[in-house]
Regions:
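Divalent metal-dependent hydrolysis catalytic cores, especially in the metallo-beta-lactamase
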Residues: 24-42, 101-103
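Aromatic-lined carbohydrate-recognition surfaces of secreted/lumenal glycan-active proteins
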Residues: 103-111
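Short beta-strand/loop segments at the ligand-binding rim of alpha/beta enzyme cores
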Residues: 2, 95-103
């Protein structure tokens, strides 16, 4: 089958995200996604908890967005944490030892801890479309160039921190709806990135709700389900 997956989503287990597990599932279904990778910043806790407890036909792929010394790296199919602050090579090696797949995420986006030229052939894939990246077109073009140069598979994810943004970028994967099968297909290049930038209005609404949450102390997501 062909799986449609957003491979880069943050939940409330990331300090800068507003996405609750309930809203993650709601918007994943609304966007027609079969699978979502939860990639919280430097923690696997939420991804494992949600994957275990979610009663949904949307497959949860446990992952992490790791802060390496040289930029951010998405690890997919993880069951244990990855140390932050290591070099790119050390981080990728640790991901591989844990049985995960290492993705060079938003390698040329501004203000995102991007890897730039630290992306290497040690990675399993490059995130060529990141729907939250700025400037979007330049980010995609530069990421496509590095993926071609390194001869690596290309994937896409939203990098969503606000539930209505989920699914603006996604990856078609030629695999059964199974986590192990999906990540193996990605590493083998049986995948196709698709998507568009998150609209400015959603980015502004995210910041409005984020700062409102900080002021009021509310921990609930303010996303409107429309």
């Amino acid at each position: 089958m062909q799986v449609k997956a957003d491979l880069h989503v943050h939940t409330i287990y990331s300090r800068d995200s507003l996405i609750t597990p309930k809203d993650l599932v709601f918007y994943a279904k609304k966007r027609g996604l079969n699978a979502v990778a939860i990639t919280d910043h430097n923690t696997i806790e939420g991804a494992l908890k949600i994957a275990k407890e979610a009663e949904t036909d949307v497959l949860i792929i446990p992952g992490i967005e790791v802060s390496s010394r040289n930029g951010h790296i998405v690890a997919l199919n993880m069951q244990e944490p990855v140390s932050k602050g290591l070099s790119v090579e050390e981080t990728v090696d640790q991901i591989h030892r844990a049985g995960g797949v290492a993705v060079a995420c938003h390698p040329f986006a501004l203000l995102k801890g991007s890897l730039g030229k630290h992306a290497s052939g040690k990675f399993d894939a490059v995130e060529t479309i990141n729907a939250s990246a700025t400037p979007f077109k330049r980010s995609v073009r530069k990421a496509e160039e590095i993926a071609a140069q390194l001869k690596l598979p290309r994937v896409a994810g939203t990098d969503a921190h606000y539930a209505p943004a989920i699914g603006y970028a996604y990856t078609f994967i030629d695999a059964p709806l199974d986590v192990d099968a999906i990540v193996k297909a990605i590493a083998a290049g049986r995948c196709q990135p698709c998507g568009m930038p998150v609209p400015l209005r959603l980015k502004l609404k995210k910041y409005y709700h984020y700062f409102n949450q900080k002021i009021t102390g509310s921990k609930s997501n303010q996303a409107e389900r429309k």
